[in-house]
Amino acid sequence: MVKKKKILVVVDAPGPAEFIESVVPLLKEKAEVLLVTVNTSTNAPYNILRKFDPLRADREKDARQIYELFNPDILAIATSSLVLGPYVNNEFTRLAHEHGIKIICFQDFWANHRWPMNWQMMKYWDKVLTPDKLAEKFLLEDGYEKKIEVTGNPNFDRFVKLNKAKERRWLRKKFNLAENDFVILYVGRGTPQSWEYEEITFDFFAKTIRLAQEEIEDKNILVAVRPHPRDENPVRYGKFFKGLRLLDTGSFPSSDDLLPIFDLVAGMQSTNHIEACYLRIPAVCIVLPKAGRLVMEKISLADFPPNLIGASVGIYSHNEESEKETFKKIISDSKCRAEIQKAQKKYFPLPKTSAAKKVAEEILKG
């Protein structure tokens, strides 16, 4: 009997956890798998992967004991999102390099290898699995010379079978929404390293939506706020709520299940904007000079990529009076929404093959 490979999988943030979630069962069919989550106080990756009963390694010193007890043949590790630490992913990567095993990095978002803690580790990665050609392009621009495989993001496989119209009807009925209710999902980005930028952005958003509603008579704008899974103060938005019509979606733990109900997605740059593109939901990425712009500069991105191709709309000016027109146009002008959706269909086609299977194959190859 051929001995099964031992694969150690490590994630430290919700995005990578969602990327690898549908891959884990496929790996377990052919290998011995140890899944490890690295958590801050919100336990975000652990909560997503809880059904697999993952080990926790929430301190850098936990890495060595876990690694040596399991003694893996392959390390599959996500690009880290914990800019402020703990830097457990880096410890696992160093250990794998010391032991001479294959290190496969999987990347869920464009250019996040440019965060300092990931930049230090790139030289150890034998292969990087990227969500698309643009992510590959950024790696090549930054001098990565080893193997790159464009696998797609397994988290987006689910959109192929999703009946958006059916789900939308069911959700709107459940929440007692009227025909003229226009629902905006505000996606939070209040992580420990970005919460100050997040408050600037949401304050701007709330003021702008209030101004837009004053001038739109045929639509009732409702806002559903979904804090980031790693937000350590998710009630921060309450101080900005005055004058907004709110839709309470707290009974749904996952934003993914709610997406079809929304008419617009807004917030600082996030994976939810990409999901909106796949579901043909207009999205607004708010990149203010003293908020989102500063976040993007830290990974050397000039703009959020979907904005550049018209698949989402970028807001760059901290001027509520002028930017209300952007929201008014999207809310009131069906031709504007159709143009956005046309670009989304062109640049974000639904996957034709399973990204989960492709990722599993590439990890098993080593």
Where are these regions (language model features)?
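Active-site and donor-binding regions of nucleotide-sugar-utilizing enzymes
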Residues: 8-163, 230-232, 254, 272-273
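Conserved catalytic-core segment of nucleotide-activated headgroup transferases in glycan assembly
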Residues: 17-26, 157-238
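Short acidic-hydrophobic, aromatic-tinged amphipathic segments that line or gate anion-handling sites
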Residues: 53-59, 245-250, 312-322
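Donor nucleotide-activated moiety binding/catalytic core segment of transferases
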Residues: 58-62, 66-67, 224, 229-274, ...
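Structural motif
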Residues: 73-76, 127, 183, 222, ...
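Short, flexible/disordered intra-domain loops and linkers
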Residues: 81-87, 192-203, 293-298
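Catalytic binding pocket for nucleotide-activated donors in carbohydrate/polymer assembly enzymes
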Residues: 125, 269-347
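C-terminal alpha-helical cap of glycosyltransferases
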Residues: 351-366
